[in-house]
Curated annotation (Swiss-Prot):
It comes from Homo sapiens. The gene is CHRNB2. Activated by a myriad of ligands such as acetylcholine, cytisine, nicotine, choline and epibatidine. Channel potentiation by calcium is stoichiometry-selective, CHRNA4:CHRNB2 nACh receptor is achieved by calcium association with topographically distinct sites framed by anionic residues within the CHRNA4 subunit and between the CHRNA4 and CHRNB2 subunits. Oligomeric amyloid-beta protein 42 activates specifially CHRNA7:CHRNB2 nAchRs. nAChR activity is inhibited by the antagonist alpha-conotoxins BuIA, PnIA, PnIC, GID and MII, small disulfide-constrained peptides from cone snails. It is linked to Epilepsy, nocturnal frontal lobe, 3: An autosomal dominant focal epilepsy characterized by nocturnal seizures with hyperkinetic automatisms and poorly organized stereotyped movements. This is Neuronal acetylcholine receptor subunit beta-2. CDD domains: LGIC_ECD_nAChR_B2, LGIC_TM_nAChR. It comes from the Eukaryota.
Amino acid sequence: MARRCGPVALLLGFGLLRLCSGVWGTDTEERLVEHLLDPSRYNKLIRPATNGSELVTVQLMVSLAQLISVHEREQIMTTNVWLTQEWEDYRLTWKPEEFDNMKKVRLPSKHIWLPDVVLYNNADGMYEVSFYSNAVVSYDGSIFWLPPAIYKSACKIEVKHFPFDQQNCTMKFRSWTYDRTEIDLVLKSEVASLDDFTPSGEWDIVALPGRRNENPDDSTYVDITYDFIIRRKPLFYTINLIIPCVLITSLAILVFYLPSDCGEKMTLCISVLLALTVFLLLISKIVPPTSLDVPLVGKYLMFTMVLVTFSIVTSVCVLNVHHRSPTTHTMAPWVKVVFLEKLPALLFMQQPRHHCARQRLRLRRRQREREGAGALFFREAPGADSCTCFVNRASVQGLAGAFGAEPAPVAGPGRSGEPCGCGLREAVDGVRFIADHMRSEDDDQSVSEDWKYVAMVIDRLFLWIFVFVCVFGTIGMFLQPLFQNYTTTTFLHSDHSAPSSK
């Protein structure tokens, strides 16, 4: 019986020993907390200083957990940060050997004195941290407090290079009620921590430098400022905004290549202009309504709208020239020289003047007229009263050749002329009238074709000008942000005026 009870007693003794040790450890921590927070020796409303002139040094460091958003239009940056604060409280000290070598204890932060460090440039009225976590207190009185916070801070948005922009959003921390004669804020690290940072899909973190600011005119002022230097990832705006704008603008190039007879020049121009206006309205809803600067995309849209407006004006001029005729306008000699001879060669254009059948006939007729081959179509017989006339074979052949027809054989003996009836004079006059009328119409058509060719040359000239300005203007605008030297020094030393004391 004694042998059976021995193992059971051993197990019961071991269990009681563990229970007593756990209760003993819990009792030790409870005794320590009661000792530290005893109202007779500790008051959380009093600054932990032995005298009024002693400074309480508070070490501060920001750990960025997440860059939630940057609202450009409202100029607000929302961040999830952990605000590390360390200081010493001589009242929260103990001897570890008196409390089972317990060197650290966690105390509710609302039961101890806290430096009232708040975000000064807050944008929504939430100056405090989101959650009052426990503070870790060491036996030597050093306190480590790491509360999480979601801050909405005011951020001045620079829209000059949007969407290839880089922003500098600052977060200024300062004690709300204590000044430099009571609390000395010190940077724990020169840069904010990114150990627990979750990458953002819209922004890249360039640098997170911190600095301690003092006011030489006010010896009681001190604050800790962190510069959040962030660069936008432009892929989203490039795909959804810039590339469609470039493609729509390239459609305006086709306006100058479109024939004037089709009647769609003005329709295409106005359609492109309306599409660009829609994109301009989208931009106005994204960027802040500031008059200090114009965003890069806005500049490009205005640039393209000016080009499209220019294409509308030139299309009106081209259509006006295209529909000119000899009855309304006379072509000046310098117009013929410039637009029919000089510019076509420079624009790599070649007028098919010598390859058209009508043009070949026109040139042959003019050559015959210069040679005098058709000077006289008929000649009268001797005697004014005679009704006899003679057909001039050479004149008939010359006139036929002038119009590109084979001369008909003339019956009769091999003389130069033969007598004919008196009614032939009237027939010859009618033929002469028809020939003169056809010659006049042919000349008018030639002038009209010259005006159309002048319009074509003007169209081609403006086409090259538009392509040149559009391509080089686009490249020059969107390469401009790449040549900007974004350095941390530029942001840190730009317009940092001395802050005013509270």
